Amino acid sequence: MNLRPEEISQIIKNEIERYEDKLEVVDVGTVIQVGDGVARVHGLENAMAGELLAFPNEVYGMVLNLEEDNVGCVLLGYDDDIVEGDIVRCTGRIVEVPVGEAMIGRVVNALGFPVDGKGPIVTDHRRPVEVKAAGVIERESVNQPIQTGYKAIDSMIPIGRGQRELIIGDRQTGKTALAIDTIINQKGEDVICIYVAIGQKDSTVAQIVGQLEENNAMDYTIIVSAGAAQLAPLQYIAPYSGVTMAEYFMNEQQKDVLIIYDDLSKHAVAYRAMSLILRRPPGREAYPGDVFYLHSRLLERAAKLKAGGSITALPIIETQAGDVSAYIPTNVISITDGQIFLEAELFRSGIRPAVNPGISVSRVGGSAQIKSMKKVAGPLRIEYAQYRELASFAQFGSDLDDETKAQLAKGERIVEILKQDQYDPMNVEDQVLILYAATNGFLLDIEVKDIREFEKGLIKFAQKKYPEIMTKVKGKDGLSDEVVAAFAECIEAYKKVFSKSV
């Protein structure tokens, strides 16, 4: 093909006009040290704290230390294929997780990837895991209850929507059981539940998933699992991923969310491991100086918003030999709005849930209690505390006056009434009825060993014979004269039925 000179010059002009400078400037560095899930990278002069770095073989890292001549970052994947001299690129973004309706009913890891074998999660929404908590102006005071289904807690240590209530106790005292029962009790309440397992055994998480599925609770629950075999950085990120998923429902859909962190002791240990490997200066119990901020910025994201929606946080802390004055327990106690203390001694003596109401407290939940529960809970707490004090003195002497004996008898029945089996949460109206019976002396002529049986029978009897009164208990009037009279009539009527069956 012959081309004329003017055609050639025209083609060259066209090519010059079409030419685009497609140079991409990327901040790159070199790995100078790697090991124990941590890498030091030289040359990333513009790296930002918390930024994602791209390593070879699709491994990502997160910047934690910004030093004079290098950057210290934790790896969100295994370091087996990363060697000194590898090229690392800045990404200009921070860790993000998928959020949205598609997450409900799924078990995901700390980065939001499914681990339940049910296929990929399809969602268009992603959110950064670290965001600023809602400000004071956006919040409103806690005024709605979140029912745990436990009589001892809903009456004496009530929890409100938007509250942060710590569950604290030694290992094997029923902390996780209390959290799981609270999730089961949210059925039909239009509450999204998120359970974050930090450093738990995979077998334990599988057991929890099975229990929630059995009770149809996975229909409104997301499980975020960073197991004991996972890397410390993933255990560190897991609670922030969980609360990010919760914030989507609170902010975008104005829904109420319940989030459980099980447990923050292991979260602090994971952060300590990362910090020590990064050579950050250790402080008390070898934790870094910012371990308080680690938990405060997480728990401050729980809120009740004026625009609607809330996040209620139930962090769990494991104590050693009941020592609540250790570093991490005192930190989290000072951040939260109260704590439920579960005592190993009570647990072993058969009082379950093993709540110690003496040092358990809810600072803001009282204003969220329903009217009828508030009325029965007042005398209950006082009488229970008096009974515990009297019982400790009564064991030293046998010559007790009649009034003391009556108080002890009433206290024994209150203790028995507050016992509850696992996976057996109770409706608030049923709780009010049985606590009313206990605090007003209706159970004094029932043997202590028969109390639990009497309780079950009374609830069934009331639901069958007095259904309209049971619905009024949750109303604005609370324990009106009409309800109180109906309660007394109902209890006396059932006592006659029960006495014939015993």
UniProtKB/Swiss-Prot annotation:
Source taxon at top rank: Bacteria
Primary subcellular site in the record, as a coarse category: membrane
The protein's role, per its UniProt record: Produces ATP from ADP in the presence of a sodium ion gradient across the membrane. The alpha chain is a regulatory subunit.
Alphabetized Pfam families for the sequence: ATP-synt_ab, ATP-synt_ab_C, ATP-synt_ab_N
GO MF entries: ADP binding; ATP binding; proton-transporting ATP synthase activity, rotational mechanism; sodium-transporting ATPase activity, rotational mechanism
Reaction equations catalysed: 4 Na(+)(in) + ATP + H2O = 4 Na(+)(out) + ADP + phosphate + H(+)
Protein name, UniProt field: ATP synthase subunit alpha, sodium ion specific
Main enzyme class: translocase
Its EC number(s): 7.2.2.1
SUPFAM superfamilies reported in the protein's UniProt record: C-terminal domain of alpha and beta subunits of F1 ATP synthase (SSF47917), N-terminal domain of alpha and beta subunits of F1 ATP synthase (SSF50615), P-loop containing nucleoside triphosphate hydrolases (SSF52540)
Family membership noted in the UniProt record: Belongs to the ATPase alpha/beta chains family.
Gene: atpA
Binding residues annotated for ATP, in chain numbering: 169-176
InterPro entries, sorted: ATP_synth_asu-like_sf, ATP_synth_asu_C, ATP_synth_asu_C_sf, ATP_synth_F1_a_nt-bd_dom, ATP_synth_F1_asu, ATPase_a/bsu_AS, ATPase_F1/V1/A1_a/bsu_N, ATPase_F1/V1/A1_a/bsu_N_sf
Subcellular location: Cell membrane
Gene3D superfamilies tied to this protein: 2.40.30.20, ATP synthase alpha/beta chain, C-terminal domain, P-loop containing nucleotide triphosphate hydrolases
Subunit structure: F-type ATPases have 2 components, CF(1) - the catalytic core - and CF(0) - the membrane proton channel. CF(1) has five subunits: alpha(3), beta(3), gamma(1), delta(1), epsilon(1). CF(0) has three main subunits: a, b and c.
